[in-house]
Amino acid sequence: MEEKLGAEIFDVDHTITKNITSLSYLLLLIKRRVFSITILRHIPYICMNYKYGHMADKHFDRHFDELVGVDKAFMDDLAVENFNNMMKKEKVYGDAKRYIDHLKGNNKKIILATSSMETIIKPLADYLGVDAIIATKFAFKDGKCLGRFEGKPAFREEKRKKVLEYIKENNIDLASSSFYSDSIHDYPLFMEVGNPVAVNPDFRLTRCAKKHGWPILKFR
């Protein structure tokens, strides 16, 4: 019988990167005139709802008319540009890259689990050399974006479900797996793994980590 091994699972925004990856990507879409600049007026509202845990299905279950018919290749190229901009502005934590490289050197399986879009995260995943991405996905057909998500976004409980599904399908041992995140929103997933690790935690996660005796890392 094949021995089950653990995995090292990482959140992305504010854990590996200093920025919100989807926001910097949105700014490029505005620059390319795919989205109107007026969409920016909704960003503070969305960010506040996310920060305080008030995000609901209605915030995710929406249609992006501006993206309907946009070429997947264009969106992929824009994701590469977004990543290159992040590297130029040093938006990827050097400590995170070194930490992941160390884990890879010990033959650990590395997984990114994020509510951000897979299209946006793919260049970062390639740079880090990870084994898998679990993320929110845009729906495409015949190489064109349908302007909606494929399934539910990988946020909070749904993120937990998607990770557990991947874990089961790939014969990974949860008890010897680690999960790294900055956000209390990932509490459901923290409670599933054997080794929860708070990275650059917000005040609620800091309090939670201290209560449970979880390690706290500071990536810079």
Predicted segments with their positions:
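Active-site neighborhood of HAD-like aspartate-dependent phosphohydrolases
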Residues: 1-53
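C-terminal cap/substrate-recognition subdomain and adjoining C-terminal extension
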Residues: 2-5, 77, 84, 88-220
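Aromatic side chains
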Residues: 10, 25, 83, 179-180
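Short linear elements at protein peripheries
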Residues: 22-23, 48-102, 106-108
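General structural signal for secondary-structure boundaries
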Residues: 31-36, 55, 70-76, 154-157
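Short N-terminal helix-initiation segments at or just after the protein's N-terminus
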Residues: 42-57, 75, 122-125, 137-139
